[in-house]
C-alpha cells in the first residue's frame, strides 16, 4: 500500500495590516483558482498579502495585490506572474451580500489570510469598515493596557 502524503496544515499567510486598518464585521471563506506553480509556492509558504484586496466585478470576486513568489524549481515553460489577479470561488448569495455591502460608503472587502483546508487552499476574506487614525491609536492603547494587566497577573502569581 502506498504511503500517505502529509498535507500541510495551518495558515499559509496572514494580512495583519488589514486587521489594523479595518473594523472586521463579517468573514467569508472562499476557494481560489490557482495554477500548479502557485500551489507549490504556497506549500513552501512563499505568499504575501500585505496590500491585497478583493475586487467585485461582473458578479465575480477577484483577489488583487497578493504576491506569490515562484519557486526556482518550478517549470521553465510556464511564465509565472507573481502578482496576477486570482479568482475567488464564493456562493451567489455570498457574492450578493458582499456586493451590497461594498456599495455602502466606508466598507471594503479585504483578504485576511490564506490557509489549508484538507488539500485545498482557502482564502479568508472579510467585510471591513475603515478605521480613522484616532481609532487605531485607541486600539493600540487598549492592547497595551491588556498586556500590562496580563503581565501584572503573571508576576503576582509568581510572588506567592
Swiss-Prot record:
Chief subcellular location: cytoplasm
Keywords: Cytoplasm, RNA-binding
One Pfam family in the UniProt entry: SmpB
Protein function: Required for rescue of stalled ribosomes mediated by trans-translation. Binds to transfer-messenger RNA (tmRNA), required for stable association of tmRNA with ribosomes. tmRNA and SmpB together mimic tRNA shape, replacing the anticodon stem-loop with SmpB. tmRNA is encoded by the ssrA gene; the 2 termini fold to resemble tRNA(Ala) and it encodes a 'tag peptide', a short internal open reading frame. During trans-translation Ala-aminoacylated tmRNA acts like a tRNA, entering the A-site of stalled ribosomes, displacing the stalled mRNA.
CDD domains: SmpB
GO CC terms of this entry: cytosol
Subcellular location: Cytoplasm
Protein name: SsrA-binding protein
Region (Disordered): 131-160
NCBIfam families: PRK05422.1, smpB
Tree of life domain: Bacteria
Stored InterPro entries: SmpB, SsrA-bd_prot, SsrA-bd_prot_CS
A Gene Ontology biological process term: trans-translation
Membership in a protein family: Belongs to the SmpB family.
Originating species: Pseudomonas fluorescens (strain ATCC BAA-477 / NRRL B-23932 / Pf-5)
Molecular function terms from GO: RNA binding
Amino acid at each position: 500500500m502506498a504511503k500517505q502524503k502529509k498535507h500541510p496544515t495551518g495558515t499559509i499567510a496572514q494580512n495583519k495590516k488589514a486587521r489594523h486598518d479595518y473594523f472586521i464585521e463579517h468573514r467569508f471563506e472562499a476557494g481560489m483558482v490557482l495554477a500548479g506553480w502557485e500551489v507549490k509556492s504556497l506549500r513552501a509558504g512563499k505568499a504575501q498579502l500585505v496590500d491585497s484586496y478583493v475586487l467585485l466585478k461582473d458578479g465575480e470576486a477577484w483577489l488583487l495585490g497578493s504576491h506569490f513568489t515562484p519557486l526556482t524549481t518550478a517549470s521553465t515553460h510556464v511564465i509565472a506572474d507573481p502578482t496576477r489577479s486570482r479568482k475567488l470561488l464564493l456562493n451567489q448569495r455570498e457574492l450578493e451580500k458582499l456586493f451590497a455591502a461594498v456599495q455602502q460608503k466606508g466598507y471594503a472587502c479585504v483578504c485576511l489570510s490564506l490557509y489549508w483546508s484538507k488539500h485545498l487552499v482557502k482564502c479568508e476574506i472579510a467585510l471591513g469598515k475603515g478605521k480613522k487614525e484616532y481609532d487605531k491609536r485607541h486600539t493600540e492603547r487598549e492592547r497595551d493596557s491588556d498586556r500590562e494587566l496580563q503581565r501584572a497577573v503573571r508576576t503576582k502569581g509568581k510572588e506567592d
